[in-house]
């Protein structure tokens, strides 16, 4: 047998594939479909893959997924769901500043550790006030103090059990006649740790645990519902106060400074400067303003697609960069403006430059499949921002409608005339607020129902983990290290190779990306259990 056919222990492995540097040195603009990653060696199970990654210089996520600041993608419901699953949502700004700030406030109030600014009432408030608060805030466990303010002496608490069976004729009854009195409450002393307080709350079997000082004055409160959320969502993205992380987008004009102030009052964690072309004097000026007024606030700059664009924003002090121009499914910037760059090349070029300064990169746009997420991360992105992939989920804004028997939701680009007509924030993003003739850089369309984020995101997480497993990377930091060291190998795909890599040779087929009748229980990381028959994105196709 010829020597080159003899196997076993030779130590010889021929060179195969291209490094990322070689792949992008060719000069062609590459999209995610234009290349593949060659497989590596597997010595771990997919559940062991650590998806922790940096959103900004100071904020880390356990899941590298972000929902886009689009008015058909992210408001409070989406942001809450994304944060619970370990990612983060960025509230869009195609609305009034007050509406946007209130959406951020809803996210921050959804889950908390020590609640230091709860709704508080006095004994003179009425049962009707509690019902009104329940409608406004979604809960009715309200502490009662002498003055109706924090820092005042605790005299009781009113819960749904106290008022559930009261009728409208009782709405004028003062709370001192309906509340659970102070002597019947379980409380914890000021200075108690969150773990100790949670233990007391569990033993008490109560819904709320007031925290009081030596003078019996209310200083904080914790809620049983938050305990359950901690159990069900161990990956949840939280700040130092145990509130869910939330981001918001703003523009780069003078009136956006007022919007910024309202968002800061609402507790926003990260600001995304929303511009189709981020390398501008407007954005640099806004970065300088924010860093002077709110030096600890994390700021994401963009969008950029070249190292030269990135340099100016990094020099101005951004904490992360958003990469992508004209690559979204509803974006036509490349066609209309002749400006942009294929997303694969954009991510690699900007990430390779920004990493030298410790600035994480967000791959924004062009994500059609979970494989595209893996490719973006393998090219150096720390996180991935998604629009169309999350559109038409239960948590996305808008109402479902039917067309030809298919359940759909509206999805539109922020550069569409549709979005521009709703609010001038969208116009500012494309520098067109003063134009007599508006030039659309996006389109409006519809997307098929994907079901809930709580079922769809676990599918994305599992897909990313399996992709990293096939590559041989046990974490995203290892994945990036393999790419920059040249250990990770790529290969360009011809059009024929792309056809071969997809479904082919069938008359018709059904595509169901994740389990329909089972779902991933939050925190189980890969163990399906029986669940309700919630619609999943299924596609039946026929070959022509």
UniProtKB/Swiss-Prot annotation:
InterPro entries in UniProt: Aldolase_TIM, CBS_dom, IMP_DH, IMP_DH/GMP_Rdtase_CS, IMP_DH_GMPRt
E.C. no: 1.1.1.205
Domain of life per record: Eukaryota
Regulation of catalytic or functional activity: Mycophenolic acid (MPA) is a non-competitive inhibitor that prevents formation of the closed enzyme conformation by binding to the same site as the amobile flap. In contrast, mizoribine monophosphate (MZP) is a competitive inhibitor that induces the closed conformation. MPA is a potent inhibitor of mammalian IMPDHs but a poor inhibitor of the bacterial enzymes. MZP is a more potent inhibitor of bacterial IMPDH.
SUPFAM superfamilies named in the record: Inosine monophosphate dehydrogenase (IMPDH)
Keywords on record: CBS domain, Cytoplasm, GMP biosynthesis, Metal-binding, NAD, Nucleus, Oxidoreductase, Potassium, Purine biosynthesis, Repeat
Record-level GO BP terms: 'de novo' GMP biosynthetic process; developmental pigmentation; eye development; GTP biosynthetic process
Gene Ontology CC annotations of this record: cytoplasm; nucleus
Subunit structure: Homotetramer.
Protein name: Inosine-5'-monophosphate dehydrogenase 1a
Gene of this entry: impdh1a
């Amino acid at each position: 047998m010829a020597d080159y056919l003899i196997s076993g222990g030779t130590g010889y492995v021929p060179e195969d594939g291209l490094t990322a540097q070689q792949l992008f040195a060719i000069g062609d603009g590459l999209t995610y479909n234009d290349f593949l990653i060659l497989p590596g060696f597997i010595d771990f199970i997919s559940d062991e893959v650590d998806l922790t990654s940096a959103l900004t210089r100071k904020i880390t996520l356990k899941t590298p997924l972000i929902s886009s600041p689009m008015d058909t993608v992210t408001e409070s419901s989406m942001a809450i769901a994304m944060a619970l699953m370990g990612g983060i949502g960025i509230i869009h700004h195609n609305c009034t500043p007050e509406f946007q700030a209130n959406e951020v406030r809803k996210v921050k109030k959804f889950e908390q550790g020590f609640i230091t600014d709860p709704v508080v009432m006095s004994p003179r408030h009425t049962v009707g006030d509690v019902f009104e608060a329940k409608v406004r805030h979604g809960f009715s466990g309200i502490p009662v103090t002498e003055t109706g303010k924090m820092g005042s002496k605790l005299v009781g608490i009113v819960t749904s059990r106290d008022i559930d069976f009261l009728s409208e004729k009782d709405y004028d009854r003062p709370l001192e006649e309906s509340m659970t009195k102070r002597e019947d409450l379980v409380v914890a002393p000021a200075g108690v740790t969150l773990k100790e307080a949670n233990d007391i709350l569990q033993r008490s079997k109560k819904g709320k645990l007031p925290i009081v000082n030596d003078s019996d004055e209310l200083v904080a409160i914790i809620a049983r519902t938050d305990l359950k959320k901690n159990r069900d969502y161990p990956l949840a993205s939280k700040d130092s106060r145990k509130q869910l992380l939330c981001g918001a987008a703003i523009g780069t004009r003078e009136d956006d400074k007022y919007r910024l102030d309202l968002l800061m009052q609402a507790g926003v964690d990260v600001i995304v400067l929303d511009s189709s072309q981020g390398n501008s004097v407007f954005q640099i000026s806004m970065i300088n303003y924010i860093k002077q007024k709110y030096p600890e606030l994390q700021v994401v700059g963009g969008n950029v697609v070249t190292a030269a664009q990135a340099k100016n924003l990094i020099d101005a002090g951004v904490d992360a960069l958003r990469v992508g121009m004209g690559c979204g499914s509803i974006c036509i910037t490349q066609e209309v403006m002749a400006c942009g760059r294929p997303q694969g090349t954009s991510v690699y070029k900007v990430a390779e430059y920004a990493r030298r300064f410790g600035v994480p990169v967000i791959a924004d746009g062009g994500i059609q499949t979970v494989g595209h997420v893996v490719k973006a991360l393998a090219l150096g992105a720390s996180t991935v921002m998604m629009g169309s992939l999350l559109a038409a989920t239960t948590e996305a804004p808008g109402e479902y409608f039917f067309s030809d028997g298919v359940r759909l939701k509206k999805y539109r680009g922020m550069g569409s005339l549709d979005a521009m007509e709703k609010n001038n924030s969208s116009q500012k993003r494309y520098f067109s607020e003063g134009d007599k003739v508006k030039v659309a850089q996006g389109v409006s369309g519809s997307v098929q129902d994907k079901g809930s984020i709580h079922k769809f995101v676990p599918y994305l997480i599992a897909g990313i983990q399996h992709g990293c497993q096939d590559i041989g990377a046990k974490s995203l930091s290892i994945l990036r290290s393999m790419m920059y060291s040249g250990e990770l190998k790529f290969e360009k795909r011809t059009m024929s190779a792309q056809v071969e890599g997809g479904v082919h040779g069938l008359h018709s087929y059904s595509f169901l990306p994740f389990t329909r009748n089972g779902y991933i229980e939050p925190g189980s990381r890969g163990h399906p259990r029986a669940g309700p028959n919630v619609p999943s994105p299924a596609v039946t196709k026929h070959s022509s």
